């Protein structure tokens, strides 16, 4: 198994569900924008949200950090909706709550595997856009990403609204 794997376009959504299902102790997510509600009966981003909620129910610590500043268009509104939906299902959700934009997109599973790249958890990003992310298993890199997540989590606060 390679220490890095390129996930182009829809390859991300074909790999992430199994990674989420395999989580044993922790899932850490950072997203610029997350859309879990919408008109589509089956949205890929909603499926990821459902998997996060199921893992939280199973006792896995699930932490989601969303952007709250800037972003224009609908990002803050979509993030508030996603935060409420996730919190109602036992997921810890926070925001940096500053004037600085958190544009990172990151997923860390059990401190052992991480994905970092351009994929937001929205139907467009997961199904239509030209996105690229990298799956990393190299533990020094994953450890550094985990440390970065934990630093952001410490200065974050619950998303209000």
Residue ranges of model-derived segments:
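Conserved beta-strand termini and adjacent loop/short-helix elements that scaffold enzyme active sites
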Residues: 7-9, 65-67, 96-98
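Signature of lipid phosphatidyltransferase scaffolds
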Residues: 9, 108-161
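Short solvent-exposed loop/turn micro-motifs enriched in small/polar/acidic residues
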Residues: 98-101, 127
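Primarily the HKD phosphodiesterase
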Residues: 23-88
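Aromatic-Pro/Gly-enriched surface loop or interdomain linker
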Residues: 1-18, 143
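Structural alpha-helical scaffold elements that stabilize or flank donor/cofactor-binding regions
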Residues: 19-20, 107
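Short, flexible loop segments at the rims of nucleotide/cofactor-binding pockets, characterized by
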Residues: 3-9, 39-41, 91-93
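Short, well-ordered alpha-helix to beta-strand connector turns
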Residues: 23-24, 104, 130
């Amino acid at each position: 198994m390679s220490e890095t794997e390129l996930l182009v376009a829809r390859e991300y959504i074909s790999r992430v569900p199994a990674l989420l299902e395999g989580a044993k102790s922790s899932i850490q997510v950072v997203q610029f924008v997350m859309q879990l509600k919408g008109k589509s009966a089956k949205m890929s981003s909603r499926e990821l949200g459902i998997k996060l909620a199921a893992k939280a129910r199973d006792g896995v610590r699930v932490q989601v950090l969303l952007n709250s500043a800037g972003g224009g268009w609908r990002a803050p509104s979509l993030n508030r909706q996603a935060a409420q939906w996730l919190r109602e299902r036992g997921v810890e959700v926070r925001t940096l709550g500053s004037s600085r934009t958190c544009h990172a997109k990151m997923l860390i599973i059990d401190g052992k595997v991480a994905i970092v790249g351009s994929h937001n958890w929205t139907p467009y990003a997961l199904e239509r856009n030209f996105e690229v992310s990298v799956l990393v298993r190299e533990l020094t890199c994953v450890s550094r990403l985990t440390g970065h997540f934990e630093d952001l989590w410490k200065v974050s606060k619950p998303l209000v609204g």
